[in-house]
Amino acid sequence: MAFEYPDFVQRVLLHDEALHRPLPTDPPNPEMIIRIREANDDEILPESGLRNLDLLPLLRGGLFYFHDSLTDAIRMVDSVPGALGDYWRQMVFRRMGEFEVARTYGRRAGELPPFQLMLRMAADDSPNMSKQSSWDSYLLAQLYEQYRFGDADLEVELRGLQRVEFDQIYRYTFRQAVGE
């Protein structure tokens, strides 16, 4: 069986302008943010006997994150305890430019199951990440910090890394939420 997100989630993730800026200041598509806010829970995580509603804030927060609405994203992901919630907080705070906070949450999250796949997916396009033995959120925070303080050459690499990271962490979160 092929993996598929619910229709609403698929439509939200189809936007080419999303997730382009490593350090966004505001969402480029405010209408999409409104649609995410107004979506009912079943549009994001369909009803099933195995679904884990505790992870729903991460899924909705992930959609906000994807569309650069980081304030909305942190409001959602902040309520979820555990390693996966910590990793999402790390992702959001890093893109907000709160690098020390991001590193702290990254350390708390530890290593998650998708990390080896993420490393393999990113290795060809990221000279920095390819030197690591596993996906390294601490290194990623350092690269974002370098970018923020003037290393514009990192932008393309960071865009690729954040895309791989988002795709795999969102997918992992969704699979956990549906009981796979």
Question: Can you say where each PLM-predicted feature lies in the sequence?
Answer:
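Solenoid-repeat scaffolds in large eukaryotic assemblies
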Residues: 73, 102-105
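Hydrophobic alpha-helical segments of small multi-pass membrane proteins
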Residues: 91-94, 109-110, 121
